[in-house]
Amino acid sequence: MHSNNKKYGLGSSGAVLVSIAKAILTFENISFDNETIFKLVTLYNLTNNISGSMGDVAASLNEGLTFYQKFNASKLNNIIESKDDIKEIINSPWDGLTIKPIYPKAKITIFARWTGEVVDTKEHVKLWKNNKENYSTEYTTFVSASNKLVEQLVAALESGDESLVLNTINKLRENLHYLESFSNIPMETAAMKNYIASYPAGKQSGSGSGDIVLAFNKSNDNFQLQLNLEQL
């Protein structure tokens, strides 16, 4: 979405590219699976210098929740440089890549709220790259903790442990604050902090400090999402 020459992102770019790729292959009667679509869109993004984790692409492949683990970027780059045929690149295994649906049993409601803030993921990525070499130890600590917490969150969602889900969300938020402490990448605005404080758990969405803030609470119903596009 655009307003006053400012771009507001809602993860829509990944969804649009996934839809276009599926539509073209369907029109051409070419069979495909979700991994093929993900790889095609990712290669397009990399070719056009579109930065990011590609998590929005993975999340757009299926309805519901998705577990996504990013591929090893340097190893993928080696594959791209060593192969001329795009089919060979797509058919090659991408080290580290995992995309699979999550089937939550936990009765949790996510309250997603639009902040009205503008955030540019590319600028955050650029800022991080400028600082990463100076904080390699801290970054390794952050990534290790994040991976463990995500695995714990998936297990809690699928086992139906609502309390552990909320506790893990808060730990993920704390870990993001740790990243903020040495990366100079702002994670939350004051309005986001106040919104999160009114719920048992919460965190920013995306690269931080903009677009969407997420709050979590136990629910009497099944796992669900409530999106509020009224400006925070």
Which role does the model predict for each range below?
Residues 1-6, 27-31, 39-51, 57-207, ...:
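C-terminal nucleotide
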Residues 8-30:
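DPxDG-like acidic metal-binding loop motif
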